C-alpha cells in the first residue's frame, strides 16, 4: 500500500482482477483521497494512524473548529500532536527555568500533563506511556474509526 497515490490504484486494480483480499496500510495511505483513488474497492482497506482519532479526542471537536477558523483548512493528520508538543516544550522550559536545550531536555522526561491527545507522559525511551493507534476502514467512501488500540 504505502501512500494513497500507490495504495489506491493497487486496491482498485486488485479488485478488478478478482483478488479478494484486505489491503492494509499505514498513515500515508489512510487518507480521504484513498477513497477517490480506490473507488468502490476502498471497502477492502484497513489502515492505521498513530494516536487517537480527532473524533475520539475529548477536545477534538473544539480543536477542529478553532483550527478551521484560524487556518481556513481542515485539521491535518498530526496537527494535534504538534499542538501538544509545543505545550510540552513550553512546560519543560518553565520547569527548567531556562531556554538552554540541555536543561530543557533534562526535565522533559518528567512531563506529566493533560494534552489534546490525552495524558502526556514518557517512558524511559521517550515514548508516550499511553500510546494509541487508531485503525480505520471505509464506509460509504468515508474514513471511519474501526478501533482504537491502547498500547
Features from the language model and the residues they span:
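Extracytosolic ligand-binding ectodomains
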Residues: 1-151
Amino acid at each position: 500500500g504505502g501512500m494513497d497515490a500507490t495504495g489506491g490504484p493497487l486496491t482498485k486494480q486488485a479488485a478488478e482482477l478478482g483478488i479478494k483480499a484486505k489491503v492494509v496500510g499505514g498513515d500515508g495511505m489512510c487518507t480521504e483521497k484513498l477513497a477517490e483513488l480506490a473507488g468502490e474497492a476502498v471497502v477492502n482497506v484497513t489502515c492505521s494512524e498513530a494516536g487517537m482519532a480527532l473524533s475520539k479526542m475529548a477536545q477534538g471537536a473544539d480543536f477542529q473548529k478553532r483550527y478551521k477558523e484560524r487556518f481556513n483548512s481542515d485539521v491535518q493528520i498530526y496537527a494535534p500532536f504538534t499542538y501538544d508538543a509545543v505545550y510540552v516544550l513550553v512546560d519543560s522550559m518553565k520547569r527548567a527555568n531556562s531556554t538552554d536545550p540541555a536543561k530543557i531536555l533534562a526535565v522533559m522526561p518528567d512531563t506529566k500533563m493533560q494534552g489534546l491527545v490525552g495524558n502526556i507522559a514518557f517512558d524511559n525511551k521517550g515514548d508516550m506511556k499511553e500510546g494509541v493507534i487508531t485503525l480505520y476502514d471505509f464506509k460509504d467512501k468515508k474514513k471511519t474509526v474501526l478501533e482504537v488500540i491502547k498500547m
